[in-house]
Curated annotation (Swiss-Prot):
<comment type="similarity">
    <text>Belongs to the TOP6A family.</text>
</comment>
<dbReference type="InterPro" id="IPR036388">
    <property type="entry name" value="WH-like_DNA-bd_sf"/>
</dbReference>
<feature type="active site" description="O-(5'-phospho-DNA)-tyrosine intermediate">
    <location>
        <position position="98"/>
    </location>
</feature>
<keyword id="KW-0238">DNA-binding</keyword>
<keyword id="KW-0469">Meiosis</keyword>
<dbReference type="GO" id="GO:0005634">
    <property type="term" value="C:nucleus"/>
</dbReference>
<dbReference type="GO" id="GO:0005737">
    <property type="term" value="C:cytoplasm"/>
</dbReference>
<comment type="subunit">
    <text>Component of the DSB catalytic core (DSBC) complex, composed of at least rec12, rec6 and rec14. The complex interacts with mde2.</text>
</comment>
<dbReference type="InterPro" id="IPR034136">
    <property type="entry name" value="TOPRIM_Topo6A/Spo11"/>
</dbReference>
<dbReference type="GO" id="GO:0003677">
    <property type="term" value="F:DNA binding"/>
</dbReference>
<dbReference type="GO" id="GO:0042138">
    <property type="term" value="P:meiotic DNA double-strand break formation"/>
</dbReference>
<keyword id="KW-0413">Isomerase</keyword>
<keyword id="KW-0539">Nucleus</keyword>
<dbReference type="GO" id="GO:0005524">
    <property type="term" value="F:ATP binding"/>
</dbReference>
<dbReference type="GO" id="GO:0000706">
    <property type="term" value="P:meiotic DNA double-strand break processing"/>
</dbReference>
<keyword id="KW-0159">Chromosome partition</keyword>
<dbReference type="Pfam" id="PF04406">
    <property type="entry name" value="TP6A_N"/>
</dbReference>
Length: 345
């Protein structure tokens, strides 16, 4: 099903949904009118790690007039989506929120309703013509052509746009996915040849993940490496980039499966800078246990080894534990260039 067909499905679903609701209201014998959405229970901290999360969908029923505020919020969101689909314009979640702040009260209300709507229809959020507000940054030798005819470059850190991309061109050999913005900014000051740098400033948003997938398709010969804190949270973020998130299980095209962990690894830190390590807490240990059970990591021996080492020594460390970080990066990329492999030890 192409993009236009998906938009037709979304439009038809919304119109039928509204029609059914109005029809129920017109029946004088009914004391209340019900609407239903498919909602998900998902673990908010482990991203894609709970393999059973996608199976725990449930239907949430809202009754009018008992849940009149929620229903009003739902129909306001549907109105915005319907307008965006008909006019073929892309709006952001924040646009919807600011159209009726008094009604929504919180941005998360809009986020949850959009997730439930797309989950109920069985489409992605982009099929609703709604994107998250820009969060991620990209830097490097890259030209991005938008569908509106604009061509943008990233010779300075560029906010990843929600506008539709028609093509991406670059001669880069490497794409570095960085967990932290501070580390990203440090690398923009270095002369890293043939390299594109991307950060989502922590846990990745959907827009940044989808941009990376488009980048991977545009640059099939480039190698994608991830740089994350040597702790369970960092590897959880790596997992979300590579395997996706339960919160957007209906967004199958946001998994960067060719992403490989560059580091830092145990030997990068503890052979030199043990004083920069921190002790694991109970939450860290619980996360490590979950990560070791995660299906995606069963075929990643390097990642499993790092997690096991964390448990064994009861320590963790941040990227900043690498004192000569720019030199370390250049050395890792040089090793990858010599080996011609997609993983570096």
């Amino acid at each position: 099903m192409n993009s236009n067909d998906k938009k037709k499905v979304v439009r038809s679903w919304i119109e039928q949904f509204v029609h059914d609701f109005v029809e129920q209201l017109s029946k004088p014998t009914k004391d209340s009118v019900n609407v239903a959405l498919k909602r998900r229970k998902h673990n908010s901290w482990n991203g894609s790690l709970d393999s059973k999360a996608n199976e725990r969908q449930k239907v949430k029923v809202f009754s009018f007039p008992r849940n009149e505020t929620t229903i009003a919020q739902l129909f306001r969101v549907l109105d915005c989506v319907h307008e965006a689909v008909i006019s073929d314009t892309v709006i952001t979640k924040r646009d919807i929120y600011y159209r009726d702040v008094d009604l929504f009260k919180r941005q998360t209300v809009v986020d949850e309703l959009l997730g439930d709507i797309s989950n109920t229809i069985g489409c992605s959020r982009s099929d609703l013509n709604v994107e998250a507000s820009a969060k991620g940054l990209v830097f490097g030798s890259i030209h991005i052509a938008l569908e509106n005819g604009t061509v943008i470059t990233a010779t300075k850190p560029l906010l990843i746009s929600h506008h539709r991309i028609s093509s991406i061109t670059s001669t880069a050999k490497w794409v570095l996915v960085i967990e932290k913005e501070a580390v990203f900014q440090t690398l923009t000051e270095e002369a890293l040849a043939d390299t594109i740098i991307v950060t989502a400033k922590g846990f990745p948003d959907l827009m940044t993940r989808k941009f990376l997938v488009k980048l991977a398709k545009a640059l099939p010969d480039a190698k994608f490496f991830g740089i994350f804190d040597w702790d369970p949270h960092g590897l959880c973020i790596y997992s979300c980039f590579k395997y996706g998130s339960n919160a957007y299980s209906h967004e199958p095209h946001s998994q960067l499966r060719n992403l490989q962990l560059l580091g830092p690894l145990y030997e990068d830190i503890f052979n030199k800078n043990q004083e920069f390590s921190l002790k694991l807490n109970k939450r860290d240990i619980k996360m490590i246990t979950t990560l070791l059970q995660f299906e995606g990591f069963q075929k990643e021996p390097v990642v499993r080894e790092q997690l096991q080492r964390m448990l064994f020594i009861q320590k963790k460390a941040e990227i900043q534990a690498i004192l000569e970080f720019p030199s370390w990066i250049k050395g890792k990329l040089a090793d990858a260039d010599k080996s011609g492999k997609h993983s570096v030890r």
